[in-house]
């Protein structure tokens, strides 16, 4: 990410033979991240390697065609990846984005047909009071 944003790993533990990593993503800018236009997105690309450097887990890889591994919206605009508090499988990816819905509740990319958000988990600016912001 560019300036104005922070991310990292707070803690890594092994719990019942499973690797757990507590990561953080913080928006230090003065607006939501990504910004207004609904096609913009920010996602976590996580790779775990073993002691020999072999990849044992990956979530959110960018494919050569620009699509994100695990994001159903790239293949079918009527679907989208939900917000995840935990990533447990490589077909899950944490994507921060807004998804618009039309009057029938279907996902749409048409600004003139959109009447609400179906998903809006964009990162709020640092210092913004989250209790006053409703998550969709």
Each model region followed by its residue ranges:
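Short, conserved sequence motifs used for protein processing/export or organelle targeting and
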Residues: 1-136
């Amino acid at each position: 990410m560019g300036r104005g944003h922070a991310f990292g790993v707070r803690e890594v533990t092994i719990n019942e033979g499973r690797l757990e990593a507590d990561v953080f993503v913080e928006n230090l800018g003065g607006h939501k991240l990504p910004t207004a236009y609904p096609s913009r997105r920010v996602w976590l690309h996580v790779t775990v390697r073993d002691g020999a450097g072999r990849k044992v887990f990956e979530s959110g890889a960018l494919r050569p065609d620009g699509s994100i591994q695990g994001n159903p919206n790239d293949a079918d605009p009527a679907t989208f990846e939900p917000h995840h508090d935990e990533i447990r499988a490589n077909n899950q990816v944490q994507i921060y984005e807004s998804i618009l819905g039309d009057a029938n509740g279907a996902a749409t990319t048409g600004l003139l047909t959109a009447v609400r958000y179906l998903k809006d988990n964009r990162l709020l600016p640092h210092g913004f009071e989250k209790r006053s912001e409703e998550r969709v």
